[in-house]
Amino acid sequence: MKNKTFLANCALVLCAVIWGMNFIFQKQASQHLGAFTFISLRYYLGVLSLLPLFFYMRRRKALAALEAGEEVERWHGRRFWLASLGASLANWGGAVLVQIGLHVADATKAGFIESAYIALVPVLDLLLFRKKTSRRVWIGIAMAIVGLYLLCISDGFSLDVNDAAIMASTLCFALHILMWSRFSPHVDALPFMVVEFLCTGTLSGPVSYTHLRAHETELHL
């Protein structure tokens, strides 16, 4: 049990490192691709990268299990697809807003603003599900935000429209995390991720196609 907890915490730390590096690449991409085009390509590539693992896990019949080892009702059919769509909408909203903001906003400041979702998660959990958070967690959140501010912000702090878009994305990502916390005991994570990534990419597809067609028209003119 302790080993599983340690490995889970290590996985979360690794996710945080990858998440932080992500802003640098997103900033570079925002200078060459529109937000919807980037999101569509990004999540379709995510689906392609997950498919080999998905089929491998499916062959092995490796199903996620709770630490207690108790059988939990798994969602299939309509409930699974509705949960996937809900998570996809929250993820898509956050991804698009942060990509729009990064077109102008500084990557380090965007990373700091985006990290504010760690405070929104327990707040929304309390408001939506009446789940209380311990004082130690709130102290940890405050320390994390102060630390991230000192790490990311060096020349003062001001907000503009692009920063506001990134701030709005934190609400979407906080909702996304809450959805995952509620859905994860009832769904197999890998198929859920594949469907979520596919839906997120597809939601951006029509807009990105329209944008590319408009760009081609401008080039011909």
Q: What are these language model-derived features?
A:
Residues M1-I39, G156-R182:
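Glycine-/small-residue-enriched transmembrane alpha-helix faces in small-molecule transporters
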Residues I18-L33, I39-L41, L45, G93-A105, ...:
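Juxtamembrane C-cap of transmembrane helices in multi-pass membrane transport proteins
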Residues N22-F23, L51-E114, L150:
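Specific transmembrane alpha-helical segments of multi-pass solute transporters/efflux pumps
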Residues S49-M57, Y117-I139:
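C-terminal transmembrane-helix exit sites in multi-pass transporters
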Residues L50, T133-I153, T170-F173, S204:
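Hydrophobic transmembrane alpha-helices of multi-pass small-molecule transport proteins
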Residues S84, T133-A144, D188-E196:
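Cytoplasmic-side transmembrane-helix entry/capping segments in multi-pass membrane proteins
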Residues T210-T217:
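Conserved small/polar residues in nucleotide/adenosyl-binding loops
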